Amino acid sequence: MSKFPTVSEILSGKVAVGEEVAVRGWVRTRRDSKAGLSFLAVYDGSCFDPLQSIINNDLANYNDEVLRLTAGCSVIVTGKVVESPAEGQAVELHATHVEVVGWVEDPDTYPMAAKRHSIEYLREVAHLRPRTNLIGAVARVRHCLAQAIHRFFNEQGFYWVATPLITASDTEGAGEMFRVSTLDLESLPRTDEGKVDFSQDFFGKESFLTVSGQLNGETYACALSKVYTFGPTFRAENSNTTRHLAEFWMVEPEFAFATLADNAKLAEDMLKYVFKAVLEERKDDMQFFAKHIDKDVITRLENFIASPFAQVDYTDAIEILLKSGKEFEFPVSWGIDLSSEHERFLAEEYFKSPVVVKNYPKDIKAFYMRLNDDGKTVAAMDVLAPGIGEIIGGSQREERLDVLDTRMVEMGLNPEDYWWYRDLRKYGTVPHSGFGLGFERLIVYVTGLQNIREVIPFPRAPRNANF
């Protein structure tokens, strides 16, 4: 074992009792007893709980330094690991030396003083909020989920592909994209028609931050069979809500020779795999969320893992909603995009389990989704989860060039702009499928937090790009 084990390694029993170690971290609290002892709670972020260090007043720097330690000071505490008589911890550290690495400049104005802070306040000090129990737990759970996603796809034979963040394509056809330009805004070059001349821009054409890696992912799926992307995406959607971010991470698998049914099975297997991983690997953090954020969060994930996914056609889902007798805020009729209240009714009240809604009207879905034989619906799916609603959206992709071209024209897109995407249908086309999972929305579901801005280190939203 290293001379500098983590707090996690010590508390989990990987360090033998009696071993001399040095622990590097930050002070969470200091408590002094009348018996001439000080109790330092030292954390290093490796796990939820701090390590209690017992410091005797015979240390040379006890009066000058130890008694001045406050929350946030960085220290290296050397000592012996011993069994702890205190409840709730198996071991503690009996210190023989305390080195103060960094002081907190003014403890009275330290933004992360040892007291309970509101979530809203923590957003204002996002550079310091990972020092709190809450955001530290979120960060570890986020890491665990990301690692589990990579493990799952690797075990399933998928290859990770890096897709570009700068693109000239609008995957969703929604137009809510951030433009990337190096043109001088004070003297923009103009065409004869008076429009901005993007041919003089850095890329020689109008360019944007990507809203999805899907189209690029499809090109590799049509060569490597199974691929996935996992990276940041951007939406210039002016939505200042608890569910939206302008910059967020997406998980997007694409696989060849796959139907919509294969797609739904992959989504179910992936979600259950990552939920199982977080419950097993981050027990302490999940117990914190269950105690302080959402008492049902662990039970909800356990039930999710144990439940077979229900499946329902969009048309049947509309019938269920119409016959429910419930008054929804948004009226129900065939052709609408299901709102969150409709999704949650289906998952929580009707099916009482995760549910895959499939075969949506073509007019509310993207151009690349495979047109069904009825000519009115596409082979699209949404996975709805109890407690949140939609968590995954996907489809079988349109592999027929003539149908794809017709859909593009119907939606006001120029097929020539997507010449490279159309090439996939010219040269050995295959049925293929994929889906998108908003990573932050997944973390919201796992932690029980109500606002998506708590689960990404530095949230980007309308009029908010601090830090």
Curated annotation (Swiss-Prot):
It catalyses: tRNA(Asn) + L-asparagine + ATP = L-asparaginyl-tRNA(Asn) + AMP + diphosphate + H(+). GO terms for molecular function: asparagine-tRNA ligase activity; ATP binding; nucleic acid binding. Its EC number is 6.1.1.22. InterPro entries: Aa-tRNA-synt_II, aa-tRNA-synth_II, aa-tRNA-synth_II/BPL/LPL, Asn-tRNA-ligase, Asp/Asn-tRNA-synth_IIb, NA-bd_OB-fold, NA-bd_OB_tRNA. It is an enzyme of class 6 (ligase). The keyword Cytoplasm applies. The keyword Transit peptide does not apply. Coiled coil: none annotated. Keywords: Aminoacyl-tRNA synthetase, ATP-binding, Cytoplasm, Ligase, Nucleotide-binding, Protein biosynthesis. GO terms for biological process: asparaginyl-tRNA aminoacylation. SUPFAM superfamilies: Class II aaRS and biotin synthetases, Nucleic acid-binding proteins. It is found in: Cytoplasm. One of its GO terms (cellular component) is cytoplasm. PANTHER family: ASPARAGINE--TRNA LIGASE, MITOCHONDRIAL-RELATED, ASPARTYL/LYSYL-TRNA SYNTHETASE. Homodimer. NCBIfam families: asnS, PRK03932.1. This is Asparagine--tRNA ligase. The lineage of its organism: Bacteria, Pseudomonadati, Pseudomonadota, Gammaproteobacteria, Pasteurellales. The gene is asnS.
